[in-house]
A protein has these predicted regions:
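Outer membrane beta-barrel
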Residues: 84, 90, 105-240, 259-262, ...
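Membrane-embedded translocation segments of transport machinery
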Residues: 222, 233-310, 323-328
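Outer-membrane beta-barrel proteins
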Residues: 67-82, 117-126, 170-175, 225-227, ...
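N-terminal periplasmic/intermembrane-space "pro-region" immediately following the signal or transit peptide
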Residues: 2-104
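Outer-membrane beta-barrel "beta-signal"
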Residues: 415-427
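Repeated loop/turn-to-beta-strand initiation elements of outer-membrane beta-barrel proteins
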Residues: 126-130, 174-177, 227-233, 265-270, ...
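Sequence/structural signature of outer-membrane beta-barrel proteins
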Residues: 94-100, 139-141, 186-188, 236-246, ...
Length: 427
């Protein structure tokens, strides 16, 4: 008999024997009670100096045991988190392939990837919070390529590292301040988009031409009123913890300021992004969109709307538009202006509770003007994705997705089609 069958038989047998065992247990208990009652009638208590000495010795031994347990408890508590520290984690695994990957230096083979994340939050006053995120991951080359960059990609060769760290504290009732050696500027915004990508980072935050890839030393403020108006500003310096120090001339620095209005069902916001020596804007960009000066002024407009009820044919809608102007461009034919846009639709609770259907389209950051005038060379790049995400239980999420694009780099032949399955485990 196989092990699984033996387990089934054993379980069934135990379930049949349980009532009999319970009845037998009742009989024994009644008999023990009768025996105890008879013994009370036949015996009289007896107490002398030997009994006292023995009982006193037992008490002393028990006290010693209690003291030993107290020491062990203190040692145990010394090795645990404080009562104000919480930890949660997430493991993500995926596998997929991209047809056409060889056209932009990727691979058409089936490749996998994973990330493992641990989040620690500690409050010292009840109103503040120290956030630390530890993360590791590794993935195939096609999930690191900027054209097909997976939404969960973390490329640090299996090393568990400090990925985020900042301290948040209130300044009065409406203002929140934050400072840290590893802040991410968009974590400090009023949420600009509610579309959650199912495959590609290109769709994150409503398009990330002005957002993202900014983790480093920084600080900022966020001001939110009860009427829905909010303002956020922060600065990140990627060279502050290196030899040149804070705000050194050669450092990559990014300063973002956002103003937003948010209600229960819709949101609009505008963000000004001032970047110096900055190049981390190419997760959703064409070849011309990447070949830009390192100093820029960018504007990001975002909006979203959601229906009153989920489970209907009316989706949530998220839109984004980004434009960038580059300074210090002197070479003829180099990009001086570029823009991008994104539209995302989400249907929730359509087949089962907590599921999600997502469809999104984006034009990657593309050149609209070049130094000296003339043709930009852009051919109308487009990228799209579609996915279905469902939860087998409260801690798991499975997301099969397809995605594709045409002319994603610069040539009319740069077309791709991909598919993958992503699994998330939260704990």
């Amino acid at each position: 008999m196989k092990l699984f069958q033996q387990m089934l038989v054993a379980g069934a047998t135990l379930s049949l024997l349980a009532p009999i065992a319970a009845q037998a247990s009742d009989i024994v208990n009644i008999e023990e009670m009768n025996s105890y009652s008879r013994s009370k009638k036949k015996k009289t208590p007896r107490f002398d100096h030997k009994t006292f000495a023995n009982d006193f010795s037992d008490v002393s031994n028990n006290k010693g045991d209690i003291n030993g347990l107290e020491v062990q408890r203190n040692q145990f508590e010394a090795g645990t988190f404080s009562e104000t520290t919480t930890m949660d984690g997430k493991a993500v695994m995926w596998a997929g392939a991209v047809d056409g990957g060889n056209e932009f230096g990727g691979s058409e083979d089936t490749q996998t990837g994973y990330t493992f994340t641990m989040n620690l939050n500690t409050s010292f006053s009840g109103d503040d919070n120290l956030y630390v995120r530890l993360k590791t991951g590794e993935q195939g080359d096609q999930w690191k390529n900027k054209y097909t960059y997976h939404i969960e990609t973390k490329d640090n060769s299996d090393l568990l590292e400090v990925d985020k760290m900042w301290y948040t504290f209130p300044l009065g009732e409406k203002v929140t301040a934050f400072v840290g050696p590893r802040i991410e500027n968009y974590y400090m915004y009023i949420t600009p988009s509610i579309y959650k990508p199912g495959a590609l980072k290109s769709f994150k935050l409503g398009g990330n031409s002005n957002f993202g890839a900014s983790t480093d030393v920084g600080y900022g403020l966020k001001y939110e009123l009860d009427n829905g108006i909010g303002f956020a500003t922060n600065v990140v310096d990627k060279g502050a913890d290196e030899g040149e120090g804070w705000f050194a001339p050669g450092n990559a620095i990014k300063w973002d300021s956002q103003i937003a209005y948010t209600t229960d069902r819709w949101h609009v916001s505008g963000t000004l992004s001032n970047a110096r020596n900055w190049s981390a804007h190419d997760y959703n960009a064409t070849t011309m969109g990447r070949q830009v000066a390192r100093d820029s002024i960018g504007y990001a407009l975002r909006a979203y709307w959601m229906p009153e009820e989920t489970g209907t044919t009316v989706p949530e809608i998220s839109v984004g538009y980004d434009t960038k102007s580059y300074g210090g461009v002197f070479t003829a034919g180099n990009t001086t202006q570029a823009n991008s846009y994104m539209v995302g639709f989400t249907w929730k609770d359509m087949i089962q509770a907590d599921d999600r259907i997502g469809i999104a389209f984006t034009q990657p950051l593309s050149a609209t003007e070049v130094q000296g005038g003339g043709d930009t060379g852009e051919v109308g790049a487009q990228v799209w994705e579609a996915y279905y995400s469902f939860r087998p239980n409260d801690s798991m999420e499975i997301t099969p997705a397809i995605f594709g694009g045409n002319d994603i780099a610069a040539d009319e032949d740069d077309d791709i089609f991909g598919l993958l399955v992503t699994s998330k485990f939260k704990f």
